[in-house]
């Protein structure tokens, strides 16, 4: 069973990510064809394969189409390389202690770190199959899964500027392509075979450092009054 890592997004933190993730095997970085040549060469010289893409004509609400395009390109390349399961990470995120975490994730069909507890953070509302009156979707900075499930999840684009959180749209697409009942409650996702791995992060002293915000997402998501896992 071969595991891989897909980094997706722009190259702002190219040195930090390339220096760290280059110690692992089967790493690709899917980014845009207008990124700095100096940055791209640095990444390549670290042994990470770079996949260059044209930006989608329609970026989508909160750049959802850009996230989808880069994520799909990365996991699809890993599929072509014969990878069975992969970790998808944003290009502003470093997951520490991966040598300990990756073996713990092996065999998971699709896994997120955590999901927003329904009805707690009520500063948004949106319509997607049913009315949602709070943040209620899984976190997507880091996602692990079977390579076929990851390809299915990211293989779509949104033509309209729908004011729906990208995380919710991506979860909806995955669940509908797998003929799952779409509801973003923790109980339903668990019942449908989706899992969460914050507990493994805690047990292995993993940090998920979101460089853009300067926070360790493990500390953020472990608050069970706000998140479930």
Where are these regions (language model features)?
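Short loop->beta transition adjacent to catalytic acidic/histidine clusters or analogous donor-positioning motifs
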Residues: 2-3, 22-29, 48
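Active-site-proximal specificity loops/subdomain of glycosyltransferases
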Residues: 32-80
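A short acidic (Asp/Glu
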Residues: 16-18, 39-41, 96-102, 154
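Catalytic core and acceptor-binding pocket of nucleotide-sugar-dependent glycosyltransferases
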Residues: 95-100, 110-125, 131-229
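GT-A fold catalytic core of metal-dependent nucleotide-sugar glycosyltransferases
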Residues: 75-112
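N-proximal low-complexity "stem/linker" segments adjacent to membrane-targeting elements
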Residues: 1-12
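Short, polar loop motifs at secondary-structure junctions
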Residues: 10-13, 31-38, 116-119
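Short, well-formed alpha-helical segments that are part of the catalytic scaffolds
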Residues: 11-23
